[in-house]
Amino acid sequence: MNVEEANKIVIRPYITEKTFALVENEQKICFLVNRESSKPRIIEAIKILYNENAIQIETARTVYGKKAFVKFDSADKARDLATKIGML
């Protein structure tokens, strides 16, 4: 997978008050992703785009699209990535 394919999978971070709290409390960041994307492909895209390893992923389909809740192994990594992508 290259960067172009990864950008088609991970559309953008999903920022709300609830997802903002997830960064601090559960080391998770929420992304809107392509509806047809699988969990392994989402993890691979996160690694390519942001150079971070995800340890767990949960997905949910909503009227806004498919959301991926990506958990990182430490609060520092989640917080640093959130700052890097403009959430904090």
Annotate each PLM feature.
Residues M1-L88:
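Contiguous, often N-terminal, cationic amphipathic patches that form binding interfaces
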